């Protein structure tokens, strides 16, 4: 017998024998659902055990995170039962997630809960989606005006990451890809992302940077870079003058969020044979117009350039 949960059954109106049968049937139905759920979970765990160790560990972590997300706080015993893992395995994963800041344990309590770090990651992803959507039109207009490679880059720990790109219309052009990382110290976008940050924060970030020289023009130390960052902030744009790659020039400007924080750099990249110093300020003006429009859409209406 199959019960439709949208229908309300009045047990009190049935004769005693039928009420008893009805109750037993309902109990059997829900027991069946519970058993099926456990069987499905066991099958999933069995499949998980067949995975390579690295994949299996990742799946277990996400299983624990999902279970933690269903409760305000939960103990190891109950959590291990839910994810069908041993308590020692669950404890080991919890301690790792706790050290990374994704899980909290209140004092001496044996209860664990999720922190807001996952929310912060989601918020960053959402911000990047909004940023890319807002930037795309401006980047395409820049591409149409200059015919050169246009990049949007963001800070990720000690590097820049290209989060959007419009390719040059020329055959001779800068080759890159979305998701590619480049150094902070030798790129125009990197300098822009650092220039508007607090000096102590910049020093902390740069302490993790390996100042690798890729050309004779590459900046080789924090002491050499800091005065350049002051100039970048003063003039409103950063430059890569063959510092990352021989034969390549780049100009970048800042993009601000609604709080006035620089969240990205917008750039034009040129082969040196197509770059003219006489036209540099025209390119800077184009970039500022585009970055101002993007910043405005991100909620910042006081673009300084």
Curated annotation (Swiss-Prot):
InterPro entries attached to this UniProt entry: ArsR-like_HTH, GAF-like_dom_sf, HTH_MetabolicPath_Reg, Tscrpt_reg_IclR_C, Tscrpt_reg_IclR_N, WH-like_DNA-bd_sf, WH_DNA-bd_sf
Domain HTH iclR-type per the UniProt entry, residue ranges: 55-116
GO molecular function term, any single one: DNA binding
Record carries keyword Transcription: yes
DNA-binding span(s): 76-95
PANTHER family referenced in this protein's UniProt entry, alphabetically: HELIX-TURN-HELIX TRANSCRIPTIONAL REGULATOR, ICLR FAMILY, HTH-TYPE TRANSCRIPTIONAL REGULATOR KDGR-RELATED
Subunit structure: Homodimer.
Name by which UniProt lists this protein: HTH-type transcriptional regulator KdgR
Gene: kdgR
């Amino acid at each position: 017998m199959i019960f439709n949960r949208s229908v309300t059954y009045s047990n009190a109106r049935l004769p005693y024998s039928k009420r008893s049968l009805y109750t037993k049937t309902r109990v059997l139905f829900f027991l069946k659902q519970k058993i099926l759920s456990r069987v499905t979970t066991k099958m999933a765990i069995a499949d998980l055990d067949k995975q390579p160790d690295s994949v299996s560990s990742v799946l277990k972590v996400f299983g624990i995170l999902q279970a933690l997300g269903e409760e305000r706080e939960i103990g190891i015993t109950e959590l291990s039962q839910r994810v069908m893992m041993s308590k020692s395995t669950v404890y080991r994963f919890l301690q790792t997630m706790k050290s990374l800041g994704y899980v909290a344990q209140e004092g001496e309590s044996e209860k664990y809960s999720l922190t807001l770090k996952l929310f912060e990651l989601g918020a960053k992803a959402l911000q990047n989606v909004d940023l890319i959507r807002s930037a795309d039109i401006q980047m395409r207009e820049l591409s149409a005006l200059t015919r050169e490679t246009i990049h949007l880059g963001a800070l990720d720990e000690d590097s820049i990451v290209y989060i959007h790109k419009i390719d040059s219309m020329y055959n001779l052009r800068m080759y890159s890809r979305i998701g590619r990382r480049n150094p902070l110290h030798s790129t125009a976008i990197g300098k822009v992302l650092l220039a508007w940050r607090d000096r102590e924060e910049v020093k902390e970030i740069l302490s993790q940077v390996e100042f690798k020289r890729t050309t004779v023009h590459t900046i080789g130390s924090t002491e050499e870079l800091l005065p350049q960052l002051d100039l970048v902030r003063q003039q409103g744009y950063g430059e890569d003058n063959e510092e990352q790659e021989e034969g390549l020039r780049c100009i970048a400007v800042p993009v601000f969020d609604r709080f006035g924080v620089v969240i990205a750099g917008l750039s034009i990249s040129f082969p040196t044979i197509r770059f003219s110093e006489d036209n540099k300020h025209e390119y800077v003006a184009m970039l500022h117009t585009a970055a101002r429009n993007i910043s405005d859409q991100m909620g910042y209406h006081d673009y300084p350039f």
